[in-house]
Amino acid sequence: MLKQRTIKSLVKTVGIGLHSGRKVTLTLRPAPADTGIVFTRVDLPEAVEIPAAAGAIGDTRLASVLQKDGARVSTVEHLMSACAGLGIDNLYVDVDAEEIPIMDGSAASFVFLLQSAGIEQQNAAKRFIRVKKAVEVREGDKLARLEPFFGFKLSFTIDFRHPAVDKTGQNFEIDFADTSYVREIARARTFGFAHEVEALREMGLARGGSLDNAIVLDEHRMLNNEELRYGDEFVRHKILDAIGDLYVVGHPLIGAYVAHKSGHGLNNQLLRALLADQEAYEVVTFDRMEDAPVAFLPQVQPAFA
């Protein structure tokens, strides 16, 4: 039986909120089978628990934001992406601010934290959402689509007309049957443009953004002294984001994701469209390992890590 997973022990870290610029303490705790991933604002007079769910995503302008009863937890996508990559089904996530810390702008720090805590199997079948028919959402020239596929693969095309991005490639495809999330996706950093950062700061946002946690571009080049971690790091980060955005559906997806210029908002619309059509998906488990997609077999790699 392909089983659910959580972490073995509590682990915590401190980082900076990308938009608030404030210090955030993040604590990850083991959770029982069938809990899902539950975020808790422990800094509020009465702690508010917000389970990760497609319907709980509110604001998506600059990040994926979970909302409930007036409480928010922002920028959840990188941590959710790491959980997906390592096959974590159940986890308590405690934060003392309204943002998950940005760390280095990728999912690598969260992968390290989760691996440091240890990952253990639980005595319950891992549930998957299998895409049964194609679902597509569009917004202008932007597109996001899920298609039936026995595994998990993603194809993403970006369209940033910028010399530094043009040089690295605007399209990337990955099939986790034969590719490692930790090696090929987790280290890809978020990126932004210097003129946009200035405008965001005037709005009280991006106060924690720096060359330490993002790739920053001016009109012509990259401002960071550090080299790119991947030749096509920009589009790989978009895939990292998409994996995290899709994982708020509550279970790993068995299907293929195709996107053109998609973002957090369109990704969430795609999940809602999928869930709204009961003929488009089914929840499945695998009693026999040999019946499961290779991408999710633990003897190959944890989840698709």
UniProtKB/Swiss-Prot annotation:
<keyword id="KW-0441">Lipid A biosynthesis</keyword>
<comment type="pathway">
    <text>Glycolipid biosynthesis; lipid IV(A) biosynthesis; lipid IV(A) from (3R)-3-hydroxytetradecanoyl-[acyl-carrier-protein] and UDP-N-acetyl-alpha-D-glucosamine: step 2/6.</text>
</comment>
<feature type="binding site">
    <location>
        <position position="241"/>
    </location>
    <ligand>
        <name>Zn(2+)</name>
    </ligand>
</feature>
<keyword id="KW-0443">Lipid metabolism</keyword>
<feature type="binding site">
    <location>
        <position position="237"/>
    </location>
    <ligand>
        <name>Zn(2+)</name>
    </ligand>
</feature>
<comment type="similarity">
    <text>Belongs to the LpxC family.</text>
</comment>
<comment type="function">
    <text>Catalyzes the hydrolysis of UDP-3-O-myristoyl-N-acetylglucosamine to form UDP-3-O-myristoylglucosamine and acetate, the committed step in lipid A biosynthesis.</text>
</comment>
<dbReference type="InterPro" id="IPR004463">
    <property type="entry name" value="UDP-acyl_GlcNac_deAcase"/>
</dbReference>
<dbReference type="GO" id="GO:0046872">
    <property type="term" value="F:metal ion binding"/>
</dbReference>
<protein>
    <recommendedName>
        <fullName>UDP-3-O-acyl-N-acetylglucosamine deacetylase</fullName>
        <ecNumber>3.5.1.108</ecNumber>
    </recommendedName>
</protein>
<dbReference type="GO" id="GO:0009245">
    <property type="term" value="P:lipid A biosynthetic process"/>
</dbReference>
<dbReference type="GO" id="GO:0016020">
    <property type="term" value="C:membrane"/>
</dbReference>
<keyword id="KW-0378">Hydrolase</keyword>
<feature type="active site" description="Proton donor">
    <location>
        <position position="264"/>
    </location>
</feature>
<dbReference type="InterPro" id="IPR011334">
    <property type="entry name" value="UDP-acyl_GlcNac_deAcase_C"/>
</dbReference>
<keyword id="KW-0444">Lipid biosynthesis</keyword>
<dbReference type="Pfam" id="PF03331">
    <property type="entry name" value="LpxC"/>
</dbReference>
<feature type="binding site">
    <location>
        <position position="78"/>
    </location>
    <ligand>
        <name>Zn(2+)</name>
    </ligand>
</feature>
<dbReference type="InterPro" id="IPR015870">
    <property type="entry name" value="UDP-acyl_N-AcGlcN_deAcase_N"/>
</dbReference>
<dbReference type="InterPro" id="IPR020568">
    <property type="entry name" value="Ribosomal_Su5_D2-typ_SF"/>
</dbReference>
<keyword id="KW-0862">Zinc</keyword>
<dbReference type="GO" id="GO:0103117">
    <property type="term" value="F:UDP-3-O-acyl-N-acetylglucosamine deacetylase activity"/>
</dbReference>
<keyword id="KW-0479">Metal-binding</keyword>
